[in-house]
Amino acid sequence: MMENTRIRVGAEAFSVGDEYTWLSQCDEDGAVVTFTGKVRNHNLGASVSALTLEHYPGMTEKALTEIIADARSRWSLQRVSVIHRVGPLFPGDEIVFVGVTSAHRSMAFEAAEFIMDYLKTRAPFWKREATVEGERWVESRDSDHIAAKRW
């Protein structure tokens, strides 16, 4: 299934259009679901001027591979693409892309949401925000852990 899986972690920007084109090439699938996360210009009541993402190389990709394998064991999926940027990012920049294909929309929607929920709670990424008050590390939210528990 690795030929039907794309995992990329890096500083480079990605093209949502290119990912959609790759995902949609499976003629047997009736559903393509994608999610793109962006840097907000605010968080926890403060203006955000930049966000720096760090990760543990090798371990991060391993965690993403395991999350995708878990999704594949729950839903019948064809292609899966997960991209996560690291390094300095700014409001409006795209951070994360999750795309999945399946025969039916319900499986594709659920699998994409599952992957995103688990990515937020199980993949080793660390965020540092720059605000007017200075820099601060962003802790994981309780809502992310609650969302992941439903699976």
Curated annotation (Swiss-Prot):
Function: Converts molybdopterin precursor Z into molybdopterin. This requires the incorporation of two sulfur atoms into precursor Z to generate a dithiolene group. The sulfur is provided by MoaD.
Keyword Signal attributed: no
Record organism: Yersinia pestis
GO cellular component, one term: cytosol
Protein name stated in the entry: Molybdopterin synthase catalytic subunit
Gene name for this UniProt entry: moaE
Catalytic function, reaction form: 2 [molybdopterin-synthase sulfur-carrier protein]-C-terminal-Gly-aminoethanethioate + cyclic pyranopterin phosphate + H2O = molybdopterin + 2 [molybdopterin-synthase sulfur-carrier protein]-C-terminal Gly-Gly + 2 H(+)
Domain of life from the UniProt record: Bacteria
Gene3D superfamilies: Molybdopterin biosynthesis MoaE subunit (3.90.1170.40)
Signal peptide range: none
Pathway(s) it belongs to: Cofactor biosynthesis; molybdopterin biosynthesis
GO biological process, one term: Mo-molybdopterin cofactor biosynthetic process
Residue numbers binding substrate: 38-40, 104-105, 120, 127-129
Family to which this protein belongs: Belongs to the MoaE family.
EC number(s) per entry: 2.8.1.12
SUPFAM superfamilies to which the protein is assigned, alphabetical: Molybdopterin synthase subunit MoaE
Subunit structure as annotated in this protein's UniProt entry: Heterotetramer of 2 MoaD subunits and 2 MoaE subunits. Also stable as homodimer. The enzyme changes between these two forms during catalysis.
UniProt cross-references to Pfam families, sorted A to Z: MoaE (PF02391)
Entry keyword set: Molybdenum cofactor biosynthesis, Transferase
GO MF: molybdopterin synthase activity
